[in-house]
């Protein structure tokens, strides 16, 4: 361990890999507190679809960056990095170990490798205008929205598939907030890391992972995911960027009578599997991770391996 830098543990892995359980049990062992590195768990009222940790699962371990925003608020890597850095300082100063657990690769990467990210903070009045502008576009279908983006940011439009509505909206929102093009944004990676980082990843065979994902989707639906999405739509959040997340965007057409339930569930499972594949590609290609094989290691074995790495 480098005593000149704050020590942090980061646990990454694809959706449904078991990051929550591992991080909580590790926190018990090493006197840690957990910072969520998930871009969706910051939102209130979006619990089941984001697989948000429950108070019972927390088992007394403090968790941070969960339930801090409303679904119509925006959150970016910049906000995450700023908040996480403050939390790491606070947790470390109290003699505890910060544990960052999550699957949003850019968020984790920006923190570990000290990306310089642009501040998108706006006043409440400016944010209100941005929301009004975005609301005026909600009637557009995916292709029309993509065409709108191409009118002022052709480079971003070329790099984003029309069906990826969330990323298209993100590029448009960025322009509305900053008057700049997302395609021109510079993301500078520093080569001096801020932290002494132990980066742990959970992996397993694709067959096992996909089976876990399919099972978890079924459990989410049994626990009321459809009703959760209904309530968010009823509360007026349907057009928000947060509602383009996997688990929400697939069920909205069912609520609106545009798709049958069974097809939406199949889409949800497929999109979740595809997302998990993208997550693993990101972590394998862009980060130096110490991988733990969940299929051949029990929870206790993984905890022992991590604590050995810390010593």
Curated annotation (Swiss-Prot):
Region called Interaction with substrate tRNA, residue ranges: 38-41, 166-170
Residues binding ATP, per UniProt: 13-20
Residue numbers binding substrate: 15-20
One GO process term, biological-process aspect: tRNA modification
Keyword Hydrolase: no
Keywords: ATP-binding, Magnesium, Nucleotide-binding, Transferase, tRNA processing
Ribonucleoprotein recorded as keyword: no
NCBIfam families per the UniProt record, alphabetical: miaA
Membership in a protein family: Belongs to the IPP transferase family.
Name by which UniProt lists this protein: tRNA dimethylallyltransferase
Native source organism of the sequence: Staphylococcus aureus (strain bovine RF122 / ET3-1)
